[in-house]
Design a protein with these regions (language model features):
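N-terminal periplasmic accessory domains that precede
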Residues: 40-43, 62-65, 77, 92-97, ...
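Transmembrane beta-barrel strands of outer-membrane/channel proteins
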Residues: 141-145, 169-175, 213-217, 267-273, ...
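Outer-membrane beta-barrel transmembrane domain signature of Gram-negative proteins
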Residues: 238-259, 265, 273-349
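N-terminal periplasmic "start-of-domain" segments of outer-membrane beta-barrel proteins
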Residues: 5-35, 63
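Flexible loop and strand-edge segments within Gram-negative outer membrane beta-barrel domains
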Residues: 176-197, 205-265, 271-289
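Short acidic/polar hinge/loop motifs at secondary-structure boundaries
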Residues: 63, 81-109, 198
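Predominantly transmembrane beta-strands of Gram-negative outer membrane beta-barrel pores used
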Residues: 75, 103-107, 123-129, 138-147, ...
């Protein structure tokens, strides 16, 4: 008599996507959970495929390096929408809490043109928890505390309103406001950060029409610089202070003509407003950045090995800057305004 046999497998934390024509890897939630606390910038600590380094240790600015090049050569995406560009790029890796992420896709080298033209050495795409998925948590929370006085709190709740409608609310709080000066040189070793982050998203999953939308709000205060004098100096301490407010909105609309061939027409819209007031000693740099992105896309699959996509895209950035790069506080602020509008069209087979 043959008894019952259970075959159990566990999905690997990092997988090479062999079905993709690009050099693409996926970091799943199993790999992300190995870090007790993390944001996007810290989630690659357990994974050697991506190198994250400080571009400015005094303020905590980080950058991702792929194929030996870093910074603007790597395109950041959130659910395949270009994000954290311009003024948000130095600290954007800290704007994505780890518990919010479902997976990360890392593409090295030439990437798909569907998401823009800015990927020179690769793309980093973050997929968040989605309320429409069957495995979505109804409610979850986690707390973190460290010996360095870093505290984090994360919570998310999902509500299935009907068979087709669902919504989720995600919240994050981070506090690391104690100054650390391990080598006693008078300067803090890491910036002191306090961050509030809230995101509400909605989803409608119809037979042919699919809709997603979300709104995100972030407030962050970041301080660094001198903690005390190391000699008999009595002058003002050199302080760095960066206050940020950021708001994002996105919507995805898709009409599916043929599910078997994945034939669909999609419209993606997103907008963000980023306000940053920065002080570096007596120098000031304040910037308001407005971004609008739109993409109209058609896709179809002929078979498992052949697919076609074509579309139109538009990206608009506006920067309103006020700055003083001299140490004389009596000097007026310099005003500068810049904008960039980039329309585009593409086809990919």
């Amino acid at each position: 008599e043959l008894n019952e046999v259970n075959v159990v497998s566990r999905r690997m934390g990092t997988m090479k996507l062999r079905s993709s024509v690009m050099n693409e890897e996926m970091i799943s939630s199993a790999e992300l959970s190995r870090a007790a606390c993390c944001n996007l910038g810290e989630s690659f600590v357990t994974n050697p495929s991506v190198d994250v380094s400080y571009s400015d240790a005094a303020t905590g600015a980080k950058q991702i390096k792929l194929l030996g090049l870093s910074g603007t050569y790597v395109q950041m995406l959130t659910e395949n929408i270009p994000n954290y560009r311009g003024a948000a790029s130095p600290y954007g890796l800290g704007y994505v809490p780890g518990p919010w992420m479902q997976s990360i896709q890392v593409s090295k080298g030439i990437s798909s043109v569907k998401n823009g033209y800015e990927a020179i050495t690769g793309q980093i795409n973050v997929e968040f928890k989605k309320p429409q998925l069957p495995e979505a948590d109804w409610v979850s929370a986690n707390l973190f505390a460290s010996s360095t006085n870093r505290y984090e709190a994360n919570a998310d709740a999902t509500l299935k309103l009907s068979k087709r409608w669902s919504t989720s609310l995600l919240a994050h709080y981070e506090n690391e406001t104690k100054a650390h000066d391990g080598n006693d040189d008078g300067f803090v070793d890491i910036p002191q950060v306090e961050q509030y982050n809230v995101w509400n998203r909605w989803a409608y999953m119809g037979d042919h029409y699919v809709f997603q939308a979300g709104f995100k709000a972030l407030s962050e205060s970041r301080t660094s610089g001198q903690a005390h004098h190391t000699d008999m100096q009595t002058g003002d301490l050199y302080k760095v202070g960066i206050d940020t407010e950021r708001y994002e909105f996105f919507t995805k609309n898709a009409y599916i003509f043929n599910k078997e061939k994945n034939t669909n027409l999609a419209l993606i819209l997103s907008a963000s407003w980023h306000n940053q007031d920065a002080m570096y000693g007596r120098k000031l740099y304040n910037v308001d950045q407005t971004n609008v992105y739109a993409s109209l896309m058609f896709e179809t699959e002929f078979n498992k090995q052949n697919s076609f996509s074509a579309g139109l895209s538009f990206n608009y950035d506006a920067y309103d800057q006020h700055y003083r790069l001299e140490n004389q506080t009596e000097l007026p602020l310099i005003k500068a305004f810049a904008k960039e509008a980039v329309p585009g069209a593409y086809a990919q087979y």
